[in-house]
């Protein structure tokens, strides 16, 4: 497995889990420790926006992302 494939696998497993602890561990592993410490609203907005940008994201996870972003006043990336 290449480094890119490993990164994508880790990213998808973390983000699609919607488990904050798992996502925080992924962020710290890849040098985004500050994002892991973000307040809830900013953290989840970042997570859901990132999910919207992933080709092949599971439909149910993508729908949760769209719903959360809409309910919290954020735009949905196209």
Region locations from a protein language model:
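Repeat-associated, polar segments at repeat-unit boundaries in modular proteins
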Residues: 68-69
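N-terminal acidic leader/helix
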Residues: 2-42, 46-49
